């Protein structure tokens, strides 16, 4: 049986938060005592707060400590997906607004997948807003440098040749606010390239 630990919405503060510190101490203690056990960890989103531009140091330290507490190999057993707070503030033209304007022109029901398929040039500016997240993910996991994988884009990473893990960024249209719209690049997720990576007899 495979067990995994899913953690989400870390929202680490740059300064010490007593409640957060207590929660982290309790979690790490349970991991070290084996009350919490996992074969791999999936950490999904909000590794910092939107207004703490580029400040991922607390999450970087925590994830290292967590993986050590669980006795896991961070390079093989940690999987990351960004959240809506993991975008950089807009500098210049807003790529989200450009995308929504085009989506509205394409069809009345704002069919995002259709717009991404027809206007692939709109995707890179959306992904570029995750540049600080990309830097953190690359510092944690060498696979994002060696294989050319984009930690903010759709991609597959196998876990120890036993399980395929498909990474989907649902925060493409996020702006750091609570009322953001969710969107994912379904065209890439269903592409022949991704389907090929999902082959090999692994679930």
What are these regions (language model features)?
Residues 1-78, 88-90, 195-199:
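N-terminal active-site segment of His-dependent metallophosphoesterases
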Residues 10, 47, 84, 169-174:
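Residue-level signal for short, function-critical loop segments
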Residues 25-29, 61, 65, 128, ...:
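Charged/polar, solvent-exposed surface patches and flexible loops
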Residues 33-40, 148-203:
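His/acidic metal-ligating clusters that form di-metal
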Residues 51, 93-95, 160:
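Generic detector of ordered secondary-structure context
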Residues 57-62, 99, 183-186:
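Amphipathic alpha-helical scaffolding segments
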Residues 65, 69-149:
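Active-site neighborhood of divalent metal-dependent phosphoester bond hydrolases
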């Amino acid at each position: 049986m495979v067990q995994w630990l899913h953690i989400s919405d870390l929202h680490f503060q740059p300064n010490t938060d007593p409640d957060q510190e207590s929660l982290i101490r309790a979690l790490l203690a349970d991991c070290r005592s084996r009350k919490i056990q996992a074969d791999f960890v999936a950490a999904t989103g909000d590794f910092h707060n939107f207004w703490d531009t580029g400040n991922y140091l607390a999450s970087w330290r925590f994830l290292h400590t967590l993986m050590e507490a669980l006795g896991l190999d961070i390079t093989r057993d940690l999987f990351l997906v960004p959240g809506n707070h993991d975008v950089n503030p807009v500098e210049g033209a807003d790529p989200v607004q450009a995308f929504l304007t085009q989506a509205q022109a394409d069809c009345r029901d704002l069919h995002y997948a259709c717009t991404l398929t027809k206007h692939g040039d709109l995707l890179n500016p959306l992904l570029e807003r995750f540049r600080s997240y990309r830097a953190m993910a690359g510092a944690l996991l060498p696979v994002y440098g060696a294989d050319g994988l984009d930690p903010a884009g759709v991609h597959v990473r196998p876990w120890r040749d036993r399980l395929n893990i498909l990474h989907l960024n649902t925060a493409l249209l996020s702006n750091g606010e609570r009322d953001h719209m969710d969107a994912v690049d379904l065209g890439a997720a269903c592409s022949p390239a991704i389907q090929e990576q999902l082959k090999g007899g692994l679930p």
